[in-house]
Amino acid sequence: MFRLVAAIAALSFAMPAQADWHVAESDHFVVYADDSEKDVRRFSEMLERYHAAMEFVTGREAETPSPSNRVTVYAVGGKRQIRELAGSKNVGGFYIPRAGGSMAFVPDVRPSTGELEWSMTILLHEYAHHFLISSSRYAMPRWMDEGSAEFFASARFPRDGEVHIGRPAYHRSAELAFAPEVPLEDLFERGRHRAGEELRRDNFYGRSWALYHYLTFDPARKGQLLAYAREIAAGASSIDAARAAFGDLGQLRKDLDRYLMQRKIKGFVLQPEILPIGEISVRRLSEGMSEMLPVMIRSKRGVDREAAAALLVDARAVAAAYPRDAGVLAALAEAEYDAGNLDAAIAAADAAIAIDPARKNAYVQKGYALFAQAADAEDETAAYEEAMK
C-alpha cells in the first residue's frame, strides 16, 4: 500500500505543473498530451490511419464507437513518468482495456516515420486486439490473437500518408533467434496466461507472428488461414482445425522455417487515398485543466481508497485555484467519488453543470455518486429512481 501511495506522490512532482496540454478527438481516439498542436494532430491522424488500414486489410468495418467508448491515450511526458505511473522499471508504455473506454499510457506523441518506439508498438499491438475482438463474432486461439496483433503492430507511417502493414517484427528478432522454440502443436494448443502462472521464456510471440505472416502472404497457403478460422468457428479445437486447414504439421514447420530464412518478406503498402479518416479536432486545454490533468491521469491509472485520498489533496488545491472551470470541477467530482466522499462528489458535479450544462463527465460522476448512495438508502427504490433522473 505504501509503495502505491509513494509512487503517486512521486509522480505529482515528476509531472510539470505549468504545462501546455492539448486534447485531440477523432472517431476512435481521444489523445491528451503536453505537446504542440501539430504533433498531437499528427499522432491522432496516425492512429486513425492505422485503424483504417486494419479495416482495409481485414475487410472488416468496425462500428464507430460512442464518444465515451473511444480509446483514450495519455502522453505523460517521458519514460520516467511512465515507469512511475506503472510502478515498474521495465515498462515503456501500457494499455488498460475497459468496457467503458480503454486507456493507453505512452511517454509522448512525437510521431515517427521510421521504426517505432517500444511504447508505440505496445499501443498498436493492444489496439489491434481491441479492433479484432470488437469486429469479430468468434474468439480465436491465443496464437492467432497474438500473431495478428504482432502482424499489425509492426506498422510504419511515412510522411506521405502511406501505412505499411505486415512489416518484419524486428522487436521479435532476438526472441526468434535465441529463445527456445515452441513446437507448432504447443503453439496451437497454448491457452491464455493465468494470473500467478509462471511466464514461459520461449518464442511464442515471435513464432505466432511468423506463422500468421507466412499464412497471410505465401501463395501456396492462400486461403488456409481463413479455412482455419472457419473450423474454429464451427467448434473444432485449435489443433484439429490446424490439421484440417494446414495439413501435415511437420511439413508446415519446415515451410515456416524456410520462410523465415528469406532475405525479404512481403508486406502491404497502403496509399493514403484508400485510407480515409474522419475529422480530427484539436484544442488547447484551459489553464485549470492543464494543472488538473496530471491528477486525472493518476486517477485514471487506477487507485485504491488510500491512494485516492492522497490524490484528492491535489485535486482540491487545483479546484480552489480555478473555481469557475467546469472541467476542473468535474474532475474534482471524480476525485471526491474515488475517495468515497459522495456528497462532495455530487456538490462538485452540480457546480460543474451549473457553469457548463454540457459537461458530460460531471453527469457521469454525479450518477455514480447517486447510485452509490442509493445502495445504502432506506428506500432503495426511491433512491434509484432519483439517481436515474
State what each model feature region is.
Residues 22, 87, 91-106, 136-282:
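Acidic/His/Gly-enriched intrinsically disordered linker/tail segments
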Residues 19-141, 155-159, 190-202, 234-247:
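Juxtacatalytic substrate-recognition/specificity segment
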Residues 117, 138, 201, 308, ...:
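Inter-repeat boundary and helix-capping residues of tandem alpha-helical solenoids
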Residues 14-16:
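N-terminal signal peptide c-region/cleavage motif recognized by signal peptidases
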Residues 1-6:
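Bacterial N-terminal signal peptides that target proteins for export
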Residues 368-389:
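Short coil/linker segments at helix-helix boundaries
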Residues 23, 234-374:
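Beta/coil-rich, acidic/histidine-enriched accessory regions frequently appended to metallopeptidases
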Residues 222, 226, 253, 309-312, ...:
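Conserved positions within tetratricopeptide repeat
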